[in-house]
Curated annotation (Swiss-Prot):
NCBIfam families: PRK01318.1-3 (NF002352), PRK01318.1-4 (NF002353), yidC_nterm (TIGR03593), yidC_oxa1_cterm (TIGR03592). One of its GO terms (biological process) is protein insertion into membrane. One of its GO terms (molecular function) is membrane insertase activity. GO terms for cellular component: plasma membrane. HAMAP family: YidC_type1. It is found in: Cell inner membrane. Belongs to the OXA1/ALB3/YidC family. Type 1 subfamily. It comes from Ralstonia nicotianae (strain ATCC BAA-1114 / GMI1000). This is Membrane protein insertase YidC. InterPro entries: Membr_insert_YidC, Membr_insert_YidC_N, YidC/ALB3/OXA1/COX18, YidC/Oxa/ALB_C, YidC_ALB_C, YidC_periplasmic_sf. It is a multi-pass membrane protein. Required for the insertion and/or proper folding and/or complex formation of integral membrane proteins into the membrane. Involved in integration of membrane proteins that insert both dependently and independently of the Sec translocase complex, as well as at least some lipoproteins. Aids folding of multispanning membrane proteins.
Length: 553
């Protein structure tokens, strides 16, 4: 039965590793064990970082009197564009008058590994990630048209908001885009005003899309999560779309509806176009060029008579995946925070972690406190497991004697083993079931710590300055290895020397793997191991005291 317990531990360990590897591949990353050769691809981009001819086509043919959507983004005799920088207390946005799009968005409250503001939207040689919009259904202003910016303040200053309006006139349609930036908000309110200044009716369609390259944001396979488009509607709810599915033309796109939004998701951060409620919208997702993708929506604005105007509004979110903030923006947006398939357990754990943080004010100590609470909840199960293991350890000499006495008769050996278990009232698998029950909680807590942007840049104490990054001095992984080694010494020693060596090797293997895990996760494991050691030692001591008392009588 010791062999069965050892085998179960090995299966559990391998299951955790293989489950993680499968989850990595499901989120578009390479397998740790079966990596596929990466093909380096380049994007054939037009000047400015985006492919030519990427203006979306209208969902339906243009009405009579309207021109077809442009096949390319080429514009003759275009005036020179300029870049306008708008700054608030939380973001710094660079708006290019070419297309009236945000070509760079810096999150001032989030820092990258070099201590600079985290860049979300970007158009550079290294990457392209843009939120674009415009009109189709005719030769109308789109994201390749050069707009004219209005005069006005560019910094928030002491005010509550700052706005920027950009206008362009083309093909009989005048489009005015107005961006409103608000204090403390990662949401940019956007208004589209369309005026027909031609002599014939027009039928413009507004499009809003998020376009980016398919490159991974963070290369470490140990804490990278899903990168790619996502779509939400009240009917289909939330679903992610992998770049691989887009390449294979297998991407699922919801049917036209009057609810929902599109998003582009990456580790810790996301962006989303959120149209006004009840506005009819059609979704699309495709690959524009090699390694360049987009997800978007089209909203028909109806027939606009000469001299008439029509307006539409939307919100553009670009910021961190802070769950409570996302819940307050629009229904379902909090789902961009990826908890994996154990969301039903992970969400309550994060809620509890938040409550603890409000009391302690430090995410590291909050993880410690949460670990203690989880350990208290599982205390009865753990105690049962440790009692069973302690009894098995006491029976070890007698079990070894039975094996030696009946080494040539396995059936007789098993019969005597079962008799011994019944006599001593020991369940040989009693130490395993409580461990199995706790596995989903551990995995859920793993995803909580992995996906929570609150851990990013959050210090604990001393050398740990970022709970979302690996321990820079590997102190926590070493402590974890030591704690696992102590645990193996408290457990019954497997009778087979090979199994015993395997159990001694496991702490080393796990500690090496955890060198690359976020410090917050390793902190949880270390604290959990220390609590387990204390509990197991106290139970072993209590059973030893009871045994001495019984012998004295």
């Amino acid at each position: 039965m010791d062999i069965k317990r050892t085998i179960l531990w090995v299966i559990f360990s391998l299951s955790v590793v293989l489950l993680f590897d499968n989850w990595q591949r499901a989120n578009g990353h390479q397998s740790m064990f079966f990596p596929t050769p990466q093909t380096v691809t380049t994007t054939a981009a037009a000047p400015g970082g985006t492919p030519a001819g990427d203006v979306p086509k209208a969902a339906a043919p243009a009405a009579a009197g309207s021109q077809a959507a442009p096949a390319t983004g080429a514009v003759s005799q275009t005036p020179a564009s300029e870049k306008i920088v708008v700054t608030t207390d939380v973001i710094r946005a660079t708006v290019d008058t070419a297309g009236a799009i945000v070509t760079k968005l810096e999150l001032l409250t989030q820092k990258d590994h070099d201590g600079n503001p985290m860049v979300l939207f970007d158009r550079s040689l290294e990457r392209t990630y843009l939120a674009r919009s415009g009109l189709i259904g005719g030769d109308f202003p789109n994201h390749t048209t050069v707009f004219t910016a209005s005069a006005g303040p560019r910094d928030l200053g002491t005010g509550g908001e700052v706005s920027l309006t950009l206008t362009a006139d083309k093909g009989g349609a005048k489009l005015a885009k107005t961006y409103v930036f608000k204090r403390g908000s990662y949401v940019i309110d956007t208004r589209f005003d369309v005026t027909n200044d031609g002599a014939a009716p027009i039928n413009p369609t507004l499009y809003m899309e998020l376009a980016r390259d398919g490159g991974a944001v963070e290369q470490s396979r140990f804490y990278s999560t899903f990168t790619g488009p996502a779509v939400y509607t009240d009917t289909d709810h939330y679903h992610k779309i992998t770049f691989a599915d887009i390449d294979k033309s297998k991407a699922h796109v919801p049917a036209p509806t009057d609810s929902g939004w599109v998003a582009m998701v990456q580790h810790y951060f996301a962006s989303a176009w959120i149209p006004a409620a009840s506005a009819k919208r059609e979704f699309y997702v495709d690959r524009i060029d090699t390694n360049f993708y987009r997800v978007g929506m089209q909203q028909a604005l109806g027939t606009v008579a000469p001299g008439a105007s029509v307006s539409a509004t939307a919100r553009l979110f670009a910021g961190p995946q802070e769950e409570r903030m996302l819940e307050g923006i629009t229904p379902g947006l909090e789902l961009v925070k990826d908890y994996g398939w154990l969301t039903i357990i992970a969400k309550p754990l994060f809620w509890l972690l938040e409550k603890i943080h409000k009391l302690l004010g430090n995410w590291g100590w909050s993880i410690v406190a949460l670990t203690v609470l989880v350990k208290l909840v599982f205390f009865p199960l753990s105690a049962t497991s440790y009692r069973s293991m302690a009894k098995m350890k006491d029976l070890q000499p007698r079990m070894t004697a039975i094996r030696e006495r009946h080494k040539g008769d396995p059936q007789k050996m098993n019969q005597e083993m079962m008799t011994l278990y019944r006599t001593e009232k020991v369940n040989p698998l009693g130490g395993c079931l409580p461990i199995v029950i706790q596995i989903p909680v551990f995995i859920a807590l793993y995803w909580v710590l992995l996906s929570s942007v609150e851990m990013r840049g959050a210090p604990w104490l001393g050398w740990v300055h970022d709970l979302a990054s690996p321990d820079p001095f590997y102190i926590l992984p070493i402590l974890m290895a030591v704690s696992m080694f102590v645990q193996t010494r408290l457990n019954p020693t497997p009778p087979d020397p090979v199994q015993a060596k395997m159990m001694m090797f496991m702490p080393i293997a796990f500690s090496v793997m955890f060198f690359f895990f976020p410090a917050g996760l390793v902190l949880y494991w270390v604290v959990n191991n220390c609590l387990s050691i204390a509990q197991q030692w106290s139970i072993n001591r209590m059973l030893g005291t009871n045994k001495k008392a019984a012998a004295a009588k």
